[in-house]
Amino acid sequence: MSADENNLIWIDLEMTGLDPERDRIIEIATLVTDANLNILAEGPTIAVHQSDAQLALMDDWNVRTHTGSGLVERVKASTQGDREAELATIEFLKQWIPAGKSPICGNSIGQDRRFLFKYMPELEAYFHYRYLDVSTLKELARRWKPEILDGFKKQGTHQAMDDIRESVAELAFYRENFIKL
């Protein structure tokens, strides 16, 4: 392993909802790729403990999705709160990339960053201010070359590490099939 400033940090959060003023992070996962999207390492996937009262605020979609995946039970059983999950993630990242070098990478990553800013500010500050958001390419493809979207299908498990792996694969798909290099 080597800390390389060209490596990319990919992150995904599962939350109890979409409003960081009301909802909370219930799962965090990270992985690191090189600049060519080769996966170098998978970080910890952490179920972040939240109270029963917080979990009771979830809407039907979140209850169904996160109960069906087993995440709700993992969250209830977890002993790691926001701070412990944040520190474990930072310790992993320090092995692979210096602070402030990687953009935050993922799908619709602005939403995740809002939650990081509120609940894991030290981790949020570890990223460069830029974003590498795969959903930007998806939206451009939808408008400019919609037929390309049939070539990549996501599983949509809404489990953080699975979602990150799909984001990396999706960006690689767009690199090969949409972007002229």
UniProtKB/Swiss-Prot annotation:
One of its GO terms (biological process) is DNA metabolic process. The keyword tRNA-binding does not apply. The gene is orn. NCBIfam families: PRK05359.1. This is Oligoribonuclease. Its EC number is 3.1.15.-. GO terms for cellular component: cytoplasm. It comes from Enterobacter sp. (strain 638). Belongs to the oligoribonuclease family. CDD domains: Orn.
